[in-house]
């Protein structure tokens, strides 16, 4: 007589087998990061993989502060540096999605003060140009670097709107027609510009009639369920924050104080990999959060479209399709570089490096946050291997 196995038992055994396989896979990638982050001279990091549009794995390794024994966990905040910009742009794109602005509107139609390139005073600057770094505005690094609150640390005492006005208007304390503006007209050349995103922060405030932080908390973070994301140190209700570390070749990592700067919408967000995953999930799931539409599908399509192919062939709205190659600086052999271009963003600030990217078609994404800098070729190669491992983990769920 043939013996039969009940269907319920088969389902139970299959479910158990799948769960064990997933657990084993997660153990493998966890072991990889545990064994390799120190080899790359990384002090502390958070990583995450998104598969099939959902967060499938995250890990935290190393220390918040070198040699402190205070370990990074999944709730530890990391400084985003320029990976802040996609979050800032969400605020602008939400207003666009609601019909409160058009991307090709002149920004001066919304500002209480006027911003124009003195070399082309009649040429309008638009939201699209600011989002794509084609506005003809420039970073004056002498001014920009001098306003970091290092070495003492803390939030900047200089208010955003005042700073931006003094930077872009004639007669302002930080105004320089030679250093703050390009010789090319708006929309005619590409040059990455942090101050353009500070200006977007001011525009968001003036359109919404709220502070940047208040608007982002209520209109972006709350609906996206980002409960551990902050713009200012003074807002953070805990001390679970990764300290930034500058690499000093002879003496070893130098621990920096938590710092800030007045152009904070361009880089000062502190958040976790789990919170930032909500942003990538929004892009991957075409504007939906938990099956609820947060941005229209056509808004996401606009977001991810190359905007100025003749002068910036990889640049979408905020996202760049060549970010990984740019991030790795091409210092490793070509075989280590991705051939397929994906939307992403990288971030660098004193003592901090961040990288996020995603594949809208395969519904995968990865996140890496560091509280130290990678300067050695060996470290860059390990970093690239980490990216590949995270994508591999993401694809298992897709």
PLM features: what roles do these ranges have?
Residues 38-46, 67-130, 182-196, 264-267, ...:
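Short active-site loop at a secondary-structure junction
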Residues 353-358, 362-372:
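Short, well-ordered beta-strand elements
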Residues 24-78, 175-181, 252-256:
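Short, conserved catalytic-motif segment at the N-terminal edge
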Residues 65, 119-346:
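Short, surface-exposed loop or secondary-structure junction motifs
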Residues 311-313, 322-325, 369-398:
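Short, gly/Ser/Thr-rich active-site loops of penicillin-recognizing serine hydrolases
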Residues 24, 28-32, 82, 87-91, ...:
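Extracytoplasmic/secreted proteins, especially bacterial periplasmic and envelope-associated proteins
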Residues 1-25:
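Bacterial Sec-dependent N-terminal signal peptides
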Residues 20-33, 155-159, 396:
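Sec-dependent signal peptide cleavage junction
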């Amino acid at each position: 007589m043939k013996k039969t196995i009940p269907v319920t038992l088969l389902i139970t055994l299959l479910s158990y087998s799948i769960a064990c396989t997933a657990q084993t896979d997660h153990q493998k990638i966890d072991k990889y990061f545990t064994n390799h982050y120190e080899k790359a001279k990384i002090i502390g990091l958070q990583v995450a993989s998104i598969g099939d549009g959902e967060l499938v794995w995250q890990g935290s390794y190393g220390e918040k502060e070198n040699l402190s024994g205070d370990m990074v966990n999944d709730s530890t905040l990391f400084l985003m540096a320029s990976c802040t910009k996609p979050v800032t742009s969400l605020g602008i794109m939400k207003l666009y999605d609601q019909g409160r602005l058009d991307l090709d509107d002149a920004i001066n139609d919304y500002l209480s003060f006027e911003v124009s390139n003195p070399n082309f005073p009649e040429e309008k600057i638009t939201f699209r140009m600011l989002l794509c770094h084609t506005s003809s505005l420039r970073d004056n690094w002498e001014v920009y670097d001098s306003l970091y609150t290092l070495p003492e640390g803390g939030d900047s005492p200089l208010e955003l709107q005042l700073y931006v006005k003094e930077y872009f208007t004639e007669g302002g304390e930080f105004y320089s027609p030679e250093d703050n503006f390009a010789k090319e007209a708006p929309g005619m050349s590409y040059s990455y510009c942090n101050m353009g995103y500070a200006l977007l922060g001011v525009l968001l405030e003036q359109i919404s009639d709220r502070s940047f932080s208040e608007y982002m908390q209520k209109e972006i973070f709350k609906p996206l369920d980002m409960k551990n994301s902050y713009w200012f140190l003074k807002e953070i209700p805990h001390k679970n924050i990764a300290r930034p570390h500058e690499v000093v070749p002879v003496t070893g990592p130098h621990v920096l104080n938590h710092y800030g700067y007045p152009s904070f919408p361009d880089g000062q967000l502190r958040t976790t990999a789990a919170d930032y995953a909500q942003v990538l999930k929004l892009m991957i799931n075409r504007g939906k959060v938990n099956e609820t539409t947060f941005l229209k599908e056509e808004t996401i399509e606009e977001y991810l479209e190359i905007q100025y192919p003749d002068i910036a062939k990889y640049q979408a709205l905020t996202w760049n399709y060549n970010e990984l190659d740019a991030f790795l600086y091409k210092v490793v052999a070509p075989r280590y570089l991705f051939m397929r271009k994906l939307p992403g963003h990288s971030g660098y600030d004193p003592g901090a490096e961040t990288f996020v990217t995603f594949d809208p078609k395969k519904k995968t994404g990865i996140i890496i946050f560091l509280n130290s800098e990678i300067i050695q070729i060996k470290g860059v190669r390990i970093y690239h291997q980490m990216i590949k491992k995270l994508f591999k983990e993401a694809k298992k769920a897709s």
